[in-house]
From Swiss-Prot:
InterPro entries, alphabetized: PRibForGlyAmidine_synth_PurL, PurL_linker, PurM-like_C_dom, PurM-like_C_sf, PurM-like_N, PurM-like_N_sf
EC number from the UniProt entry: 6.3.5.3
Residues that coordinate or bind ATP: 35, 471, 508
Catalyzed reactions: N(2)-formyl-N(1)-(5-phospho-beta-D-ribosyl)glycinamide + L-glutamine + ATP + H2O = 2-formamido-N(1)-(5-O-phospho-beta-D-ribosyl)acetamidine + L-glutamate + ADP + phosphate + H(+)
One annotated GO biological process: 'de novo' IMP biosynthetic process
Active-site residues, as the UniProt record annotates them: 32, 78 (proton acceptor)
Principal cellular location given in the protein's record: cytoplasm
Residues reported in the UniProt entry to bind Mg(2+) 2: 100, 252
Functional note: Part of the phosphoribosylformylglycinamidine synthase complex involved in the purines biosynthetic pathway. Catalyzes the ATP-dependent conversion of formylglycinamide ribonucleotide (FGAR) and glutamine to yield formylglycinamidine ribonucleotide (FGAM) and glutamate. The FGAM synthase complex is composed of three subunits. PurQ produces an ammonia molecule by converting glutamine to glutamate. PurL transfers the ammonia molecule to FGAR to form FGAM in an ATP-dependent manner.
The protein, known as: Phosphoribosylformylglycinamidine synthase subunit PurL
Any one cellular-component term (Gene Ontology): cytoplasm
Pathway: Purine metabolism; IMP biosynthesis via de novo pathway; 5-amino-1-(5-phospho-D-ribosyl)imidazole from N(2)-formyl-N(1)-(5-phospho-D-ribosyl)glycinamide: step 1/2
Lineage: Archaea, Methanobacteriati, Methanobacteriota, Thermococci, Thermococcales
Subcellular localization(s) per the UniProt record: Cytoplasm
Length: 704
């Protein structure tokens, strides 16, 4: 909390808050809980379209899939905890977002994990990578929710740090919707799940400041302890309770613990609460009311239930061997009152906890884009360097640790442009997540637009019509004028791109203060998207003899590219997005898929056309012969990361029909046992065996 905020609190209260009140206010006024630096700007994002049932404002967003099925989606970051204790930090990040989905009344059916680390040459970064993945794998596998996609990226700005974002998707029937707020007084507040311990105390205040040099030792107690077995029981018990229709409001005890869950639950509609803190089941002896109220122990839910229904729902919790206790009640008066063993120990106006004033930090525009010379290097050598890049090689080492098929819904597995989950016999849900901090660092506005259009292309590539988005905004300290400016520019880019496609953001997360010892991360907006796809229309893969075509224009756009990264070039101009072209090309590709004219579609993004073609070769173990004549230099055509492009494969007899729908540049043909790419006479020639060995096995070798 800042000094001017403490002064404001004293003025509003007319007195000095006691230690417990101060601790609760610190939690609620933290950046992590209050969004005080971002709230004003988040209003620029579109939040409504014909698919949206519930937009931002609760624990997760809801989209209509059909009349009987709603899709619930949310995204969270667990960056600081994962940097300090990677296993526990990542695992509890999964647990938290799963409970956010659960408390809307939905069954969690899938996870996505966009995760980022420093260069793998360093042992500390390999350690963070290994244990973040292990934390996500162990927790997701044990609760029976498949991790079906995500992205893994390595960047020098993340040295000794990690960005761990987790998205969760749930499915529900409309009649099971439960809100996170109460609409009447007199309800009992019931805590269910794990006992409360001292773990995670000050977790949200720790997440609202930069990490110091000794964070690993000093901040470990702020990281919560994961318990996936209790979470699994909590999922089943909560859903059974929800299906009775007797749960009036439901919140997960996440950041800010009981203080945050209870005050937000009652305060949204202007009610208050009495909390009997001594009734909270404790894991450790001698805990104080302050520790109880702000502990962030995991696997706990807060239910609002009518007094006459408490015993009935209590029996459900007991059936799953979950501890439960009535810890408070909803009152008409807008006050938040805490008792401890019969003694009143805190009393605050509810508004003081839930209505935190916004802060606008100074902004300073930065311009670092400049045209640069591409270093002299042969096409073959450049290809080898890019193809071996940890950002390009397969992340099978990651997703092989995840059970991505539990629940039996996974139609398209990890590693492709989007995962697809079967929702009913006819339709599936496509899900994907993307970010590009290198582009966003060069130009936050165009970089952010680029993230959105890549999400759209990834959904479209499997034949899905995009429905909605969620965003996770990872930034350094907003107190840095350049960072705050880049944050606002990012939101403008995210908004403009989504509006062009008629898409809405239904939920999201802002994570500031991502820096270690004065070293800020690059602007890293991550966007996850969902789309609806007809299962029988999904393109299943190229066949021998198929033609390969490129939809979309390739320009000389190497700024922020993977080629520049491996060559050590940090400047350049980020690729620009033409929203009209993106829309037109997306519509054309959907039509090609709908009419069954193409055998496969792949979005062109990181690594450009060269990488997209080589991925096609390795994914399906097919040879490719490609000969291209272009006005661009071979390196520019091969590795440009221009937006709006798709690789499509199709039988030769469909060529004329394809051309009628989309302007297409023929690149070559599927066949043989070699990958041959010739641009203006300059050649890359590799066996499919060599390509595949590097692609599938390189990360295992690095992590061995």
């Amino acid at each position: 909390m800042f000094p001017h905020e403490e002064k404001l609190i004293r003025e509003k209260l007319g007195r000095e808050p006691n230690d417990l009140e101060k601790a609760m206010l610190e939690v609620m006024w933290s950046e992590h809980v209050s969004y005080k630096s971002s709230r004003k700007w988040l209003k620029l994002l579109p939040t409504k379209n014909e698919h949206v049932i519930l937009g931002p404002g609760e624990d997760a967003g809801i989209i209509k899939f059909d009349d009987k099925t709603w899709i619930v989606i949310g995204i969270e970051s667990h960056n600081h905890p994962s940097a300090v204790e990677p296993y526990g930090g990542a695992a509890t990040g999964v647990g938290g977002i799963v409970r956010d989905i659960l408390c809307m009344g939905a069954r969690p059916i899938a996870l996505l994990d966009p995760i980022r680390f420093g260069p793998l040459e360093k042992e500390k970064n390999r350690y963070l990578f290994e244990y973040v993945v292990k934390g996500i794998a162990d927790y997701g596998n044990r609760i029976g929710v498949p991790t079906v996609g995500g992205e893994t990226e390595f960047d020098e700005s993340l040295d000794n740090y990690t960005l761990v974002n987790v998205a969760c998707i749930g499915i529900m029937r409309p009649e099971h919707l439960v809100h996170s707020y109460v609409t009447e007084p007199g309800l009992k507040l019931v805590i269910v799940g794990n006992r409360t311990g001292r773990d995670g105390i000050h977790g949200v205040t720790f997440a609202s400041e930069e990490l110091g040099e000794n964070a690993e030792e000093e901040d470990r107690s702020a990281v919560q302890i994961p318990d996936p077995f209790t979470e699994k029981l909590l999922i089943e018990a909560t859903l059974e309770a929800v299906y009775t229709g007797k749960v009036k409001a439901l919140k997960d005890l996440g950041g800010g613990g009981l203080t945050c869950a209870a005050s937000e639950m009652v305060g949204k509609r202007g009610f208050g609460a009495i909390i009997y803190a001594d009734k909270v089941p404790l894991r450790e002896p001698g805990m104080t009311p302050l520790e109880v109220m702000i502990s962030e122990s995991q696997e706990r839910m807060l239910f609002a239930i009518k007094p006459e229904d408490v015993e009935e729902l209590g029996k459900i919790f007991e059936k799953y061997e979950l501890e439960w206790s009535v810890v408070g009640e909803v009152i008409e008066e807008p006050k938040f009152i805490v008792y401890w063993k019969g003694r009143k120990v805190a009393e605050l106006p509810i508004e003081l906890l839930t209505n935190v004033p916004t802060i606008e930090w100074p902004m300073k525009e930065y311009r670092i884009e400049e045209d640069v010379e591409t270093p002299q290097i042969s096409l073959e050598e450049a290809f080898e360097k890019v193809w071996r890049s940890p950002n390009v090689i397969s992340k099978r080492w990651v997703w092989e640790q995840y059970d991505h098929e539990v629940q039996g819904r996974t139609v398209i597995k990890p590693g492709f442009d989007s995962a697809v989950l079967k929702i009913n016999e006819e339709y599936g849900l496509a899900i994907t997540a993307d970010g590009n901090p290198t582009h966003c660092y060069l130009n936050p506005y165009h970089g952010a637009m680029g993230v959105v259009v890549e999400v759209v292309r990834n959904l479209v590539s499997v034949g899905a019509k995009p429905l909605a988005l969620v965003d996770n905004l990872n930034f350094a300290s907003p107190e840095r004028p350049e960072v705050y400016w880049s944050f606002v520019e990012t939101i403008k880019g995210l908004a403009d791109a989504a509006k062009a496609f008629g898409l809405a953001y239904v939920s999201g997360n802002v994570s500031f203060y991502n820096e270690v010892v004065n070293k800020p991360v690059k602007p890293t907006p991550v966007v996850a998207g969902v789309g609806k796809v007809k299962l029988e229309k999904i393109p299943r893969g190229p066949r021998e003899g198929d033609l390969i075509g490129l939809i979309g224009e390739t320009r000389k756009e190497l700024g922020g590219s993977e080629l520049y990264r491996v060559l050590g070039v940090s400047k350049g101009i980020a690729p620009r997005v033409d929203l009209e072209v993106e829309k037109r090309n997306a519509e054309s590709v959907l039509k090609l898929i709908e009419e069954g004219l193409v055998s496969f579609v792949h979005d062109v993004s990181r690594g450009g056309v060269a990488v997209a073609l080589a991925e096609l070769s390795t994914w399906f173990n097919v040879g490719i012969k490609s000969e291209i004549t272009t006005s661009l230099l071979p390196l520019d055509f091969a590795f440009s990361e221009s937006h709006g492009r798709y690789i499509v494969t199709f039988p030769e007899e469909n060529l004329e029909a394809v051309k009628k729908i989309a302007p297409i540049t023929l690149l070559g043909r599927i066949g043989g046992e070699k990958f041959e790419l010739k641009i203006n006479g300059e050649k890359v020639s590799k066996t499919v065996k060599w390509l595949s060995d590097v692609h599938w096995n390189e990360l295992y070798r690095i992590m061995d």
